[in-house]
């Protein structure tokens, strides 16, 4: 993707130097990032074709300001800012906010609103006048579809059912079940665009304006491939590890630290063994399909006194 961006810029401004800033949390593997950027892995790097691109990194939360004010021409974030600064509460009946109800669902919506405004407000401060922000996030479309639930199996309900069964079977405690919460909020389109369309909102007053918004469903490539090769074992071996890589940390965090490490890991192994059996029994309908909200915003002007939402 970035190679296409740089190629387009080079056609118009062949002699310009470009600065590319990566941002992630301090505990992220920046060493692996720059090994990839500098072509020290098996993947081709854009630097091999565009040596005038200068790369930098920032180890800060994107819920705060990362770059100097009015210094950014183009900002891009994908599949990231649905994560919250913290879970606002435990969910009594589910592991994810899509299954939360009543006050608990409202708490996640409110935390999602606050963190979204912090994210957009920080980017608004960084953008130059007429600078552009492109954000792609898991969301909820007009039909109620969301990541993990776009017409096949409901991925979050399956993991929740297994986790709840573990309580009934004495594998985990009720406290551990309630302590397992993904710090995420899937926003509707209305929730996504409110800060950049409401004249009373501080983000809107900072000059950030909505240019375009749409939702798209992106089908799981592993599930698509399975419809052709029909090899269940191959599908399981490709599909389950891709989920485990990012689901496991949150599930593990819910298990009491008073348990020995090997016991905690054994519970996680059992969770994914049962999930794997579910996939083997009924592979059709499984797949990690995305339902994403695509937003493009522009900073229309630079106010004399921009509000700092991350203060």
Please report, for each region that a protein language model flagged, where it lies by residue.
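Conserved SAM-binding loop of SAM-dependent methyltransferases across substrates and taxa
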Residues: 1-14
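Conserved SAM-binding motif I beta-strand of class I
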Residues: 17-25
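S-adenosyl-L-methionine
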Residues: 31-65
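Conserved beta-strand signature within the Rossmann-like core of class I S-adenosyl-L-methionine
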Residues: 74, 100-106, 130-138
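A mobile, often basic/glycine-rich helix-loop segment
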Residues: 77-110
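Helix-to-beta-strand junctions that scaffold the AdoMet/dcAdoMet cofactor pocket
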Residues: 89, 127-129
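Substrate-binding/catalytic lobe of Class I Rossmann-like enzymes that use SAM or dcSAM, i.e.
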Residues: 129-263
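Core SAM-dependent methyltransferase catalytic element
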Residues: 199, 288-311
């Amino acid at each position: 993707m970035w190679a296409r961006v740089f190629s387009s810029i080079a056609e118009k401004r062949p002699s310009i130097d470009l600065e590319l800033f990566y941002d992630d949390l301090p505990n992220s593997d920046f060493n692996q990032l720059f090994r990839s950027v500098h072509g020290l892995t098996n993947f081709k790097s854009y630097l091999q074709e565009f040596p005038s691109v200068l790369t930098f990194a920032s180890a800060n939360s994107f819920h705060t300001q990362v770059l100097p004010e009015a210094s950014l021409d183009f900002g891009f974030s994908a599949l990231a800012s649905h994560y919250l600064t913290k879970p606002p509460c435990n969910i009594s009946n589910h592991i994810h906010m899509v299954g939360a109800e009543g006050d608990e669902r409202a708490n996640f919506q409110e935390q999602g609103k606050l963190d979204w405004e912090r994210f957009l407000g920080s980017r608004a401060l960084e953008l130059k006048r007429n600078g552009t922000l492109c954000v792609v996030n898991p969301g909820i479309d007009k039909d109620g579809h969301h990541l993990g639930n776009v017409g096949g199996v409901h991925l979050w309900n399956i993991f929740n059912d297994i986790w709840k069964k573990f309580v009934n079977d004495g594998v985990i405690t009720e406290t551990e079940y309630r302590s397992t919460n993904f710090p995420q909020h899937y926003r509707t389109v209305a929730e996504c665009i409110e800060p950049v369309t409401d004249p009373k909102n501080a983000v809107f007053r900072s000059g950030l304006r909505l240019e375009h918004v749409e939702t798209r469903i992106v089908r799981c490539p592993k599930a698509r491939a399975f419809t052709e090769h029909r090899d269940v074992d191959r599908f399981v071996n490709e599909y389950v590890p891709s989920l485990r890589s990012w689901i496991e940390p949150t599930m593990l965090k819910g298990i009491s630290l008073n348990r020995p490490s090997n016991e905690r890991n054994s519970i996680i192994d059992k969770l994914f063994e049962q999930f794997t059996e579910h996939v083997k029994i009924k592979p059709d309908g499984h797949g990690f399909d995305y339902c994403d909200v695509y937003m493009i915003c522009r900073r229309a002007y630079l106010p004399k006194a921009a509000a700092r939402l991350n203060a």
